[in-house]
């Protein structure tokens, strides 16, 4: 029979053991938190820059895309202080919007406009502010709230741009375009100044592959995905008279195929379990890159980043933890639902004519705008042919309208020549990114032939004064 003293000694021992275990567990928890903190420190901060580069109601889809992206980032855990939004902000409360204060990105979709910060709006949405924001140059921005990317060598940056594009450039609603060479030089400056750890760029625009092809270096820790290659259009979706259509009262396209593919994928998936490469293939299949009539999603830059999880850039939504992926999600969008972005302004005006009472002032104004737009396009088509003939001193110049360089080469070697001709074409011929600037590839061909720049500028002035 054991003594009371023996029982007491056992109890003391067990008590000491419990205290030791508790302290050990506490120490382990503290160590685990230290490791977690260390990991977070190593990962740094996630920054995002979102740019809708257009204005006017018929371009509804670009601001819808950007607003949708913002909602994904916020649900993913990014803070407003680390998200910078560029958008003209003329859609939500446009007199043409039948749902004031609301923007949707898909039929029967929820409002994506609510809560979106207005960092840079109206004339502040321009290329100079865009570059200065990326470079963290607070003194260089004008208008807006002055927010810039204050990133460092441990931070990851996500850039998403949605708008019109053309060979060698993407648009802004005011001022100059974002030229491919200039943009890549900004990225190289950011790398040299150690402004980031890794960067992901998504670009929704026609001929968007030309922004990086043969230009973006592979050693910058930058991974870029474009809606189209350097030679083709991207596509609008959820458009009137297509399937599935938008609510009839909205009257224009709600989204773009590339954009809604990555956005809707991100809405559903657990981003901590999906890699950049996996999303690339999901988006590529949904856009229908295997079908000749659609655009071909392209990727450029640092290939070793393909295994990175999307959560490192756009965060993760805890609500998606139990999502089960199904291949049906990545099925191609029906061709019947696609519209060439350069035709969307025409479609928009046609819809206005159909909806307006016959003979009304609204109907007559829309008919006049439609006729003017069609005539302007015919004039641009003729002007570019005349420019080519006058520049290269040849009569058969049709091949210069469509010929492109070998895959992997940049659009042009002499970017100063290219920018000069593009600006001249805009100023003298009224070419805009909505239509006329689709011919910038032909201007690049002139530069690549070594034709004198002054001679071509003179040809542009002459052709557009006929």
Curated annotation (Swiss-Prot):
Keyword set includes DNA repair: no
Keyword field contains Secreted: yes
Active site: 164, 206
Modifications after synthesis and translation: Auto-catalytic activation.
Signal peptide stretch: 1-24
GO cellular component: extracellular space; plant-type cell wall; protein storage vacuole
InterPro entries: AE, Legum_prodom, Legumain_prodom_sf, Peptidase_C13
Gene3D superfamilies: 1.10.132.130, 3.40.50.1460
Cystine residue pairs: 239-253, 417-447, 429-464
Pfam family for this entry, one: Legum_prodom
Top-level EC class: hydrolase
Expressed in which tissues: Seed specific. Restricted to developing seeds at 7 days after anthesis, and, at lower levels, detected in flowers. Detected in siliques, specifically in seed coats (at protein level).
Coiled coil residues, start to end: none
Activity: how regulated: Strongly inhibited by biotin-YVAD-fmk (a caspase-1 inhibitor) and by Ac-DEVD-fmk.
Protein localization: Secreted, Extracellular space; Secreted, Cell wall; Vacuole
Top-rank taxon: Eukaryota
Glycosylation sites: 137, 322
Keywords of this entry: Cell wall, Disulfide bond, Glycoprotein, Hydrolase, Protease, Secreted, Signal, Thiol protease, Vacuole
Disruption phenotype: No macroscopic phenotype, probably due to functional redundancy. In plants lacking all vacuolar-processing enzyme isozymes (e.g. alpha, beta, gamma and delta) shift of storage protein accumulation from normally processed polypeptides to a finite number of prominent alternatively processed polypeptides cleaved at sites other than the conserved Asn residues targeted by VPE. Delayed cell death of the two layers of the seed coat.
Site feature Required for post-translational maturation and enzyme activity, where: 253
PANTHER family the UniProt entry points to: HEMOGLOBINASE FAMILY MEMBER, VACUOLAR-PROCESSING ENZYME DELTA-ISOZYME
Role according to the record: Asparagine-specific endopeptidase that may be involved in processing of proteins targeted to vacuoles. Probably involved in post-translational proteolysis of seed storage proteins in the protein storage vacuole of developing seeds. Exhibits a caspase-1-like activity in extracellular granules. At the early stage of seed development, required for the formation of the seed coat, by regulating cell death of specific cell layers in inner integument.
Family, per entry: Belongs to the peptidase C13 family.
Protein name: Vacuolar-processing enzyme delta-isozyme
Species in which this protein is naturally found: Arabidopsis thaliana
Upper lineage: Eukaryota, Viridiplantae, Streptophyta, Embryophyta, Tracheophyta
């Amino acid at each position: 029979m054991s003594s009371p003293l023996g029982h007491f000694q056992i109890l003391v021992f067990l008590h000491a053991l419990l205290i030791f275990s508790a302290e050990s567990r506490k120490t382990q928890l503290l160590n685990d938190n230290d490791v977690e903190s260390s990991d977070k420190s190593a990962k740094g901060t996630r920054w995002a820059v979102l740019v809708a580069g257009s204005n006017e109601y018929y371009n509804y889809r670009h601001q819808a895309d950007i607003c949708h992206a913002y909602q994904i980032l916020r649900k993913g855990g990014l803070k407003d202080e680390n998200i910078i939004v560029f958008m003209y902000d003329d859609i939500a409360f446009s007199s043409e919007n039948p749902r004031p204060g609301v923007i949707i990105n898909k039929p029967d979709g929820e409002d994506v406009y609510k809560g979106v910060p207005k960092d840079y709006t109206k004339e502040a949405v321009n290329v100079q502010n865009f570059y200065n924001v990326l470079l963290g140059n607070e003194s260089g921005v004008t208008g807006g709230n002055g927010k810039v990317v204050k990133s460092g060598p441990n931070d990851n940056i996500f850039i998403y741009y949605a708008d019109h594009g053309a060979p060698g450039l993407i648009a802004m609603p005011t001022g100059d375009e974002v030229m491919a060479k200039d943009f890549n030089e900004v990225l190289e400056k950011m790398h040299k100044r150690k402004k980031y750890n890794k960067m992901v760029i998504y670009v929704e625009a026609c001929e968007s592959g030309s922004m990086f092809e043969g230009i973006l270096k592979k050693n910058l820790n930058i991974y870029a995905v474009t809606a189209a290659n350097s030679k083709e259009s991207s596509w609008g979706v959820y458009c009137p008279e297509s399937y599935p259509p938008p609510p009839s009262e909205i009257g224009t396209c709600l989204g773009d195929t590339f954009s809604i593919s990555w956005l809707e994928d991100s809405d559903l998936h657990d981003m901590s379990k999906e890699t950049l490469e996996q999303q690339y293939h999901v988006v590529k299949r949904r856009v229908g890159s295997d079908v000749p009539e659609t655009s071909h999603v392209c990727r450029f830059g640092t290939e070793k980043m393909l295994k990175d999880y999307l959560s490192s850039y756009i965060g993760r939504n805890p609500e998606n933890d139990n999502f089960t992926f199904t291949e049906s999600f990545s099925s191609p969008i029906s061709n019947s639902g696609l519209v060439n972005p350069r035709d969307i302004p025409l479609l928009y005006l046609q819809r206005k004519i159909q909806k307006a009472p016959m003979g009304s002032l609204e109907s007559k104004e829309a008919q006049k705008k439609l006729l003017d737009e069609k005539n302007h396009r015919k004039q641009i088509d003729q002007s570019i042919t005349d420019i080519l003939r006058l520049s290269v001193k040849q009569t058969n110049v049709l091949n210069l309208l469509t010929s492109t360089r070998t895959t992997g080469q940049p659009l042009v070697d002499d970017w100063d020549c290219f920018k000069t001709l593009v600006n001249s074409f805009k100023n003298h011929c009224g070419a805009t990114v909505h239509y006329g600037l689709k011919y910038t590839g032909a201007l690049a061909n002139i530069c690549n032939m070594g034709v004198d720049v002054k001679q071509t500028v003179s040809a542009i002035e002459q052709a557009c004064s006929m």
